[in-house]
Amino acid sequence: MGAVCVDSSVCTIIETVNTPLYIVADPAEISGIERDSLLVTRVGTLNCAFALIDALTTARIHGNLPSRLVNVGTAGALVDGLSGVFEISHVLKHDFSNDAIAAITGHPYPNGIDLDVSGLLPTARLATGDSFIGDSASRERISRQASLVDMEGYVVALAGQRFGIPVTLLKDVSDNADDKAAGTWTDALPASSRRLMEALEALAL
């Protein structure tokens, strides 16, 4: 299965069976990538969900599900001193009140997915949500659950779980999820893109 997409509504499916599908929110996050199977979802959980489910549903209909979902992109550091690329070992949704909903409904609502890792890169826990974290209060709150924060990773992990496809999440630290984050993210992209490409090569993906 192959997909080259410029946004969530324009996606061309190509016949490249049993290969990984590479997923990015913004093409600048991995500008040097040359892959037959690249899905650009745009930023945010809903954009990612619609683009990814469209691609995977079409692929399943044609019997061309990818061998692995590989999400590469940037993340904010919730803990001081983090830098470089991390392979995600656990991902959760930081803006989903699963405990409160479980108490109200009487049914469990799990919020967290464990992922297998290669052992070749540093690992981290990732929190996903639809807010760009750029204030100290939010940073401190979310840091109780994870050390990195992004806006798509949990969606990719959940889609992989639902479709029975292995998942790899690679996140490069682009900012410190603080009041300077919005101003530093764009400047960090070229170096982040290069490091993510090096990580893909290290994992032979």
Please describe what each predicted stretch is.
Residues 16-21:
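Extreme N-terminal starter segment of soluble prokaryotic enzymes
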Residues 27-205:
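Glycine-rich phosphate- or other oxyanion-binding loops that anchor nucleotides, phosphorylated ligands
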